[in-house]
From Swiss-Prot:
This is Large ribosomal subunit protein uL24. InterPro entries: KOW (IPR005824), Rib_uL2_dom2 (IPR014722), Ribosomal_uL24 (IPR003256), Ribosomal_uL24_CS (IPR005825), Ribosomal_uL24_KOW (IPR041988), Translation_prot_SH3-like_sf (IPR008991). It comes from Buchnera aphidicola subsp. Schizaphis graminum (strain Sg). Disulfide bonds: none annotated. The keyword DNA repair does not apply. Belongs to the universal ribosomal protein uL24 family. GO terms for cellular component: ribonucleoprotein complex; ribosome. Pfam families: KOW (PF00467), ribosomal_L24 (PF17136). Coiled coil: none annotated. It comes from the Bacteria.
Amino acid sequence: MALKLRRNDEIIILTGKDKGKKGIIKNILSSNKAIVNGLNLVKKHQKPLPSQNKNGGILEKEAPIQISNIAIFNPELKKADRIGFRFEEGKKVRFFKSNKKTIK
């Protein structure tokens, strides 16, 4: 089955510390995880690397989140929605299940 979420989709977090927050998918990983801009931040302790001119310290980094814990955000209804597929003019397109509108 095709993966229903894609890069640059506006999503909402369903569970976890960032529950209810909205963001944009930055990257989809092959392990059914996604990286969302500005959400699910973790602190990473980085050693300085003088050879690469990188400073050390405690950095905040976006961690991957399970795809099952996020849902696409329907801006018309202002809530989470499910995605379906259908064919329009010979092309497979995604649509919101609640109001049957095509996802751009």
